[in-house]
Curated annotation (Swiss-Prot):
Keywords: Ribonucleoprotein, Ribosomal protein, RNA-binding, rRNA-binding. GO terms for cellular component: ribonucleoprotein complex; ribosome. This is Large ribosomal subunit protein bL9. HAMAP family: Ribosomal_bL9 (MF_00503). It comes from the Bacteria. One of its GO terms (biological process) is translation. It comes from Xanthobacter autotrophicus (strain ATCC BAA-1158 / Py2). GO terms for molecular function: rRNA binding; structural constituent of ribosome. Belongs to the bacterial ribosomal protein bL9 family. Binds to the 23S rRNA. Pfam families: Ribosomal_L9_C (PF03948), Ribosomal_L9_N (PF01281).
Amino acid sequence: MDVILLERVAKLGQMGEVVKVRDGYARNFLLPNGKALRATKANKTRFDTMKIELEARNLERRKDAEAVAEKLNGQSVAMIRQAGESGQLYGSVSTRDIADGLTAAGFTVDRQQVILNHPIKTLGVHVVPVTLHPEVEVTVKVNVARNADEAERQARGEDVRTARDEDAEIEAELAIERAEVAAELAAEEGTEG
């Protein structure tokens, strides 16, 4: 189906372009969301009359998005999740979770604006792009941790997974030393008696 784009659509085209898309994409997404019109002669003339108004509305939305982008760019959102010793999450952090976290921080972000190729399934600080407007994109840091203390340590730059591994190594070394001391004591008692 040929459609006239009423706004810039990522990976499709700019406002005013006539593009060919699959029927389902047009009927289920572009047309209901007001992002496109069917490419008929009547709609082409209608678009030409609406073009100035659409450009003005697009410019206003872009300015609003840029104002929010200044505050949002580089923000950090902490997500507390349960995870195994290796840092693998029991579950995942999705676009909805990130959008809810940003909304709780005082920003108006919809889950469709958060760009994730796949859900986050590991501990750590992840950089996630957020598209506020087709022409305005910012990045936020998603800090996935087991608890608030761990989130603070990760925010400072510590790798919590290696810190836990180091703690486990120290504990193992202490256990070996204790076993050696116990063996020495047992050997001394055996030679005395």
